[in-house]
From Swiss-Prot:
Pfam families: ARD. GO terms for molecular function: acireductone dioxygenase (Ni2+-requiring) activity; acireductone dioxygenase [iron(II)-requiring] activity; iron ion binding; nickel cation binding. This is Acireductone dioxygenase 1. It comes from Vitis vinifera. It catalyses: 1,2-dihydroxy-5-(methylsulfanyl)pent-1-en-3-one + O2 = 4-methylsulfanyl-2-oxobutanoate + formate + 2 H(+); 1,2-dihydroxy-5-(methylsulfanyl)pent-1-en-3-one + O2 = 3-(methylsulfanyl)propanoate + CO + formate + 2 H(+). Ni(2+) binds at H90, H92, E96, H135. Binds either 1 Fe or Ni cation per monomer. Iron-binding promotes an acireductone dioxygenase reaction producing 2-keto-4-methylthiobutyrate, while nickel-binding promotes an acireductone dioxygenase reaction producing 3-(methylsulfanyl)propanoate. InterPro entries: ARD, ARD_euk, RmlC-like_jellyroll, RmlC_Cupin_sf. Coiled coil: none annotated. Keywords: Amino-acid biosynthesis, Cytoplasm, Dioxygenase, Iron, Metal-binding, Methionine biosynthesis, Nickel, Nucleus, Oxidoreductase. The keyword Metal-binding applies. Transmembrane segments: none annotated.
Length: 188
């Protein structure tokens, strides 16, 4: 089943904050994202401090560090420059875990054929991008998102811009996606 918050992107030079749907639109299912190692949950952002499901996810996956990040022109110095940095294609050596508490934005991930898939995260969406997946982030035209960032251990957010085919996390990701190793915690 396809959802209306993930789709194959039309690549062009228009504003990165636009949806960039193909014509006709080509939506992507949660199962397709899961095949790429991307996990998704729909949670209650209004009571995240007491959310039992969030607590269980954090405990089972070892997410013991959390902080909050507000992204909007009024709160981020050099906003346009930061947005350009987030939109540069990169990988991380660790998972990227983001929970959208307010607002919305887009995570773009590369599929197995190197096509961009745009994932629209909105209030209540929690997404986990596996270590080694090529991706980027931008806000949508609302220009605001409040994200919870989750980490295993001390927060490390080092971006390695493409190409990174020899990076250990990238090699491991390719191996896992190719051989479908491991069974992730069930996401919905």
């Amino acid at each position: 089943m396809a959802i209306e918050q993930a789709w194959f992107m039309e690549e062009n030079d228009e504003d990165q904050r636009l949806p960039h749907h193909r014509n006709p639109k080509q939506f992507v299912s949660l199962d397709h994202l899961a095949d790429l190692g991307v996990l998704y949950w729909k949670l209650n952002p209004k009571d995240y401090e007491n959310d039992q499901e969030l607590k269980e996810i954090r405990e089972s996956r070892g997410y013991n560090y959390m902080d909050l990040l507000d992204l909007c022109p009024e709160r981020v110095e050099n906003y346009e420059e930061k947005l350009k940095n987030f939109y540069t294609e990169h990988i991380h050596g660790d998972e990227e875990i983001r929970y959208c508490l307010e607002g919305s934005g887009y995570f773009d991930v590369r599929d197995k054929e190197d096509r961009w898939i745009r994932i629209w995260i909105k209030e209540g969406d929690m997404i986990v991008l596996p270590a080694g997946i090529y991706h980027r982030f931008t806000l949508d035209t609302g220009n605001y998102v409040k994200l919870m960032r989750l980490f295993v251990g001390e927060p490390v957010w080092t971006a390695y811009n493409r190409p990174q085919e020899h990076h250990p996390a990238r090699k491991n990701y390719i191996n896992n996606v190719t051989h479908k190793v491991g069974v992730p915690l069930e996401a919905h």
